[in-house]
């Protein structure tokens, strides 16, 4: 049986359809990455149909996102993912060493004439209740990543998942009251399986939509503020509203827009430095 490409593997990984968790895919060696998996990373404009609330196709839209080159896309996405995961670690695990554990100051029995092995403390690492050898200590696991590099990783993952993406009309006002059954019926009208992992990206989410979807364990409801790389890679289907598509095209669009933002930031910094120099001269 030939290996298949899932949504998870569409950007960086080759996965088995029987694998349900992302942890099996995080540490595959480059030798296990097929040419087909690399070829799915695209940079061209994706045309996606727009579905109505009833599931009918009412038009189409384009998703024009910047993607990393084929030879570096896997490394960019992998770096963005591992950085996010490392930055989520608290690093608060702590153990007591032999010098920190309470007690053990007195010698338990004389050095000689007991027939037993010599022992100077009851808090040796060899004894129960003793100190821990090479145990964990509080540590900062965070890793720095350039903003542009992180944005490139997200846009590459989104653009490579266009085949598993659908665009729908705004449906916030369609739910007059919270009803999970109605939301599941809506997913099926859009061709989504409630048992598959789905990611909904909306610029504005009403309370009724949140309450109707939160009991579906395979569904993630995100906004532009909570959009992250792990949830994109961990989902099998991606559902975008029309306003979310406009946001993605504006935020993760072509390189010129990114350069313009950097120039604006540089101008702001230059202006701040000029003001400081003026104040110092006065």
Swiss-Prot record:
Residues 1-43 form a transit peptide. InterPro entries: Ribosomal_uL4, Ribosomal_uL4-like, Ribosomal_uL4_dom_sf. It is found in: Plastid, Chloroplast. Pfam families: Ribosomal_L4. GO terms for cellular component: chloroplast; ribonucleoprotein complex; ribosome. GO terms for biological process: translation. The keyword DNA-binding does not apply. Its main location: plastid. Residues 86-133, 251-282 are annotated as: Disordered. Keywords: Chloroplast, Plastid, Ribonucleoprotein, Ribosomal protein, RNA-binding, rRNA-binding, Transit peptide. This protein binds directly and specifically to 23S rRNA. May play a role in plastid transcriptional regulation. HAMAP family: Ribosomal_uL4_B. Belongs to the universal ribosomal protein uL4 family. Part of the 50S ribosomal subunit. This is Large ribosomal subunit protein uL4c. It comes from Nicotiana tabacum (Common tobacco). The gene is RPL4.
